[in-house]
């Protein structure tokens, strides 16, 4: 498939108004809870926290409070994605593959943290779409 076509297909998919089933939304909520657990557990280790924060935010017993001090979506995305990936990679053999769907949730967090007008339903829908896009590209 030509790169241009992939870009167009993804863009078209992202601009469609799709209503996901309750089953899809429930599965996504569980995935989100898993990711939050990964972030929290990874924050209990010094190495990933030092790397994720570049040593700039000191130690904090709640990894989610660190976000309030961050200046940009990019910084939030990097921080949450590193913690998620670090724990997933060290926790389960399947996450050692080249891409894991929860890798993308940090990006969604970064975006939605700075777009307060968005709601949880839109957040969950974006996660479903990220999973579907990554799954199709992986095939």
What are these regions (language model features)?
Residues 1-139:
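N-terminal core-entry segment
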């Amino acid at each position: 498939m030509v790169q241009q076509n992939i870009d167009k297909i993804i863009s078209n998919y992202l601009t469609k108004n799709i209503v996901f089933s309750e089953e899809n939304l429930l599965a996504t909520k569980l995935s989100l809870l898993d990711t939050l657990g990964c972030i929290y557990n990874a924050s209990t280790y010094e190495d990933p926290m030092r790397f994720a924060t570049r040593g700039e935010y000191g130690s904090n017993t709640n990894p989610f409070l660190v976000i309030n001090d961050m200046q940009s979506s990019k910084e939030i995305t990097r921080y949450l994605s590193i913690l998620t990936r670090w724990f997933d990679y060290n926790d389960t053999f399947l996450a050692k593959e080249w891409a894991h769907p929860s890798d993308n949730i940090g990006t969604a967090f970064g975006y939605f943290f700075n777009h307060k007008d968005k709601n949880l339903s839109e957040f969950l829908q974006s996660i479903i779409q990220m999973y579907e896009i990554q799954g199709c590209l992986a095939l």
